[in-house]
């Protein structure tokens, strides 16, 4: 591993050796499955505080298509501005989730999510894995910042290796 993603409270629990071996990405967003709207991601930490605590980068989570998309986008834009001032990279985890979104988002939705992350100031975007290799390749090729893929169907180790080889 090159980095770990943790919430701010976990920073104090990390042994000093972790800071020497891995990049620390502090996740600023949180919610629970018990919330009235579990797709709403609340900002629970500040960029400046994370920098003081030793973060190498921060991340935010935005659910596009959710009923609270507007507030999540405003929060992400403000975090991007704070990251620029602090000199910290921003990882945007942008997931299509909400009333009008299918379980497996369409290619155009993922292209929009990647573009939105770029437009709002992210340095890296994490998107849900979708469809065939050619679809994800199109998303990756269209995006001027690095794209991380999250999730995907459960497959054998061999199938996963073949998929990774195809994407690379």
Segments predicted by a language model, with ranges:
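Alpha/beta enzyme core
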Residues: 1-5, 9-149, 154-168
């Amino acid at each position: 591993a090159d980095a770990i993603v943790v919430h701010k409270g976990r920073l104090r629990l990390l042994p000093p050796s972790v800071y020497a071996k891995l990049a620390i990405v502090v996740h600023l967003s949180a919610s629970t499955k018990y919330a009235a709207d579990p797709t709403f991601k609340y900002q629970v930490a500040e960029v400046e505080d994370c920098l003081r605590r030793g973060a190498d980068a921060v991340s935010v989570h935005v659910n596009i298509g959710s009923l609270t998309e507007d507030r999540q986008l405003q929060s992400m834009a403000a975090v991007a501005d704070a990251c620029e001032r602090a000199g910290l990279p921003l990882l945007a985890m942008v997931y299509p989730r909400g009333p009008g979104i299918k379980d497996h988002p369409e290619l155009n939705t993922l292209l929009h999510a990647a573009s939105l992350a770029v437009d709002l100031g992210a340095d890296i975007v994490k998107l849900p894995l979708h469809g065939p290799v050619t679809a994800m390749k199109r998303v990756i090729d269209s995006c001027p910042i690095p794209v991380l893929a999250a999730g995907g169907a459960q497959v054998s180790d061999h199938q996963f290796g073949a998929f990774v080889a195809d994407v690379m």
